[in-house]
Amino acid sequence: MKILISDPLAKEGIERLKKERGLEVTEAINLEEKELIETIAQYHALIVRSETKVTKEVIDVASHLRVIARAGTGLDNIDVEAATKRGIIVMNAPEGNTISAAEHTISMMLALSRNIPQAYLSLKEKRWDRKRFMGTEVYGKILGIVGLGRIGSEVAKRAQGLEMRVIAYDPFVSSEKAEERGITLFELEELLPQVDYLTVHTPLTSHTKGMIGEREIGLMKKGARIINCARGGIIEEDALYKALKQGKIAGAALDVFEKGKPFDSPLLELDSIVFTPHLGASTEEAQKRVAIVIASQVMDALKGGEVRNVVSLSTLSSFEKISP
């Protein structure tokens, strides 16, 4: 069976696939959609990260495709509905980058609090602006987490280690479960006025797109700070820009954007924002981990073994073993 890898994957995962008897592995990085459409018909599995767009047009001509595997978490670059209708399994590897994403969130929060990127650039320009970059402690502050899944929970643990008070909104987590972690749950409208820092950790879906907009930001206290290391589009950038310009929000830290590369975004003009180019999962450990995990999952799925981390459950009627 043939496997196409269309985004960079750590060598440990590729080597594992190539060692498996009966599998033919092709690496073709940075394919245009037209090129992917022209070549996909011959493959039984497609492994991607976030760059490759697996559109309905690609899926419609993928006559032999059985598995689409996302080496990572987010699925907004894959038309899961179209794949499901075609009976193609869509899977991801959500646990592989959990720690890296949580650590990056905390790093962004601290950099935002102490104006580290701005102070760095100032010093590079041979200026000594200590007063200009007066920061704020996170100790004793309230962190609001929207989405208390794997990453949100790890962020909570680290924030508690910094002696922050952590509260959260997640309709899928029970109050009892949250309280076991020392976290109090609130409805979103109740949470927002309380927080000094707000961080979002949800997938991008029709329900979460724009969930932090002008109305929600308006509920927050003056001087609060916002962090998004999850998915672009969860926070409305126009509303965030307006709130930052007006001084309603003191600052923001963004690792993701509504458009993949926000070079024409007015947000880049603001000094009150810390930016990184989607680095949440960009650690050696996370890349190796997700590559190994997704390689194992693809091999098992193609060979009729245990099928893990599937997001298109209606495609699994012919499989006996399913693992979450």
Give residue spans per PLM region.
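Short glycine-/small-residue-rich Rossmann-like dinucleotide-binding loops
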Residues: 51, 73, 196, 202-204, ...
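Rossmann-like dinucleotide/phosphate-binding beta-alpha-beta segment
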Residues: 131-222
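Rossmann-like dinucleotide-binding domain for NAD(H)/NADP(H)
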Residues: 90, 214, 222-324
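An N-terminal-biased, well-structured beta-alpha scaffold segment characteristic
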Residues: 1-91, 191-193, 213-219, 236
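Short, conserved active-site loop motifs that form the nucleotide-linked donor/cofactor pocket
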Residues: 23, 88, 183, 272-274
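N-terminal Rossmann-fold cofactor-binding loop
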Residues: 7, 29-30, 170-172, 230
